[in-house]
């Protein structure tokens, strides 16, 4: 499995699950019943698909916005037109990532990996794409691999756990069983290259603490150095983050920034958002 955990582990390891009203099974069941006939739920600038999306709406609405100034959040809510598309690889942690994005004032839409085609994603004209964690291997991830290959050259992509493995495999790497075995809620120090990793890890201590829920990694021996560069590692040298050499807006992490075991996780999401914003400014300047 790419990400080894259960829904109960997600609740224990995530600040989103810990404080969300959706943690009440009765309240969640009631919300699901009211919206059972509605395929799409939209609220407060974010849109999600299916019953699992109800919890995301509740959690995002309830979350605090302490990671970024209120003015920045309000500006995003007022000015963003294009969504960030979240490809959900059927993982219980996906909506904890969505909560962070909601707290940062982002407009996003969530779709399971078999709900859309690449053409559907193109028509949505997203400003960025987040590829979520998930069970299995990259080949089991619906459109995730194809998204990296076809849309990565033009659209910023952030892969988490399975998402990083999709990036690795898309560009020629081999995904293997982790030498240290299954990581299930393990806390590990992660060290990053302060030059190559500054886009995602700016402002973080080096090393920082990260939550790991995975049994697969990108193999070091077949790492595609011609296309990608590793940006962060565990103490025993396992690759914990990477980016594309040419398309530096393709980035991913093996650990879980959305877990409470990763204290700086929201900052990592914020850094990716700011990277998108800077890229948009750069592209706008090139057009003028």
From Swiss-Prot:
SUPFAM superfamilies: Class I glutamine amidotransferase-like (SSF52317). L-glutamine binds at residues 134-136, 165, 215-216. The keyword Disulfide bond does not apply. One of its GO terms (cellular component) is chloroplast. Pathway: Amino-acid biosynthesis; L-tryptophan biosynthesis; L-tryptophan from chorismate: step 1/5. Residues 1-58 form a transit peptide. Induction: By the phytopathogenic fungus Bipolaris oryzae. GO terms for biological process: L-tryptophan biosynthetic process. Keywords: Amino-acid biosynthesis, Aromatic amino acid biosynthesis, Chloroplast, Glutamine amidotransferase, Lyase, Plastid, Transit peptide, Tryptophan biosynthesis. The active site is at 161 (nucleophile), 256, 258. Residues 83-282 form the Glutamine amidotransferase type-1 domain. It is found in: Plastid, Chloroplast. GO terms for molecular function: anthranilate synthase activity. It catalyses: chorismate + L-glutamine = anthranilate + pyruvate + L-glutamate + H(+). InterPro entries: Anth_synth/Amidotransfase, Class_I_gatase-like, GATASE, TrpG/PapA_dom. Part of a heterotetrameric complex that catalyzes the two-step biosynthesis of anthranilate, an intermediate in the biosynthesis of L-tryptophan. In the first step, the glutamine-binding beta subunit of anthranilate synthase (AS) provides the glutamine amidotransferase activity which generates ammonia as a substrate that, along with chorismate, is used in the second step, catalyzed by the large alpha subunit of AS to produce anthranilate. This is Anthranilate synthase beta subunit 1, chloroplastic. The lineage of its organism: Eukaryota, Viridiplantae, Streptophyta, Embryophyta, Tracheophyta. The gene is ASB1.
């Amino acid at each position: 499995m790419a990400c080894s955990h259960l829904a109960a582990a997600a609740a224990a390891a995530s600040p989103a699950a810990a404080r969300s009203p959706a943690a009440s099974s009765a309240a969640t069941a009631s919300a699901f019943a009211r919206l059972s006939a509605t395929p799409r739920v939209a609220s407060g600038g974010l849109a999600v698909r299916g019953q699992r999306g109800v919890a995301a709406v509740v959690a995002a609405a309830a979350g605090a916005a302490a990671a970024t100034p209120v003015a920045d959040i309000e500006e995003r809510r007022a000015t963003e037109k294009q969504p960030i598309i979240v490809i959900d690889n059927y993982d219980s942690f996906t909506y904890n990532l969505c909560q962070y994005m909601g707290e940062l004032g982002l407009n996003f839409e969530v779709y399971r990996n078999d709900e859309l085609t690449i053409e559907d994603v193109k028509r949505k004209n997203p400003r960025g794409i987040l590829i979520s964690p998930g069970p299995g291997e990259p080949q089991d991830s619906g459109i995730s691999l194809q998204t990296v290959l076809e849309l990565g050259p033009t659209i910023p992509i952030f892969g988490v756990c399975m998402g990083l493995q999709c990036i690795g495999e898309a560009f020629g790497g081999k995904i293997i069983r982790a030498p240290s075995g299954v990581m299930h809620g393990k806390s590990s120090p992660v060290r990053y290259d302060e030059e190559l990793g500054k886009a995602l890890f700016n402002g973080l201590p080096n090393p920082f603490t990260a939550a790991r829920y995975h049994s697969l990694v990108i193999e070091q021996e077949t790492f595609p150095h011609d296309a990608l560069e590793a940006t962060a590692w565990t103490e025993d040298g396992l690759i914990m983050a990477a980016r594309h050499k040419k398309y530096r807006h393709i980035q991913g992490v093996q650990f879980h920034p959305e877990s409470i075991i990763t204290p700086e996780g929201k900052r990592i999401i914020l850094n990716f958002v700011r990277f998108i914003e800077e890229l948009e400014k750069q592209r706008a300047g090139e057009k003028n």
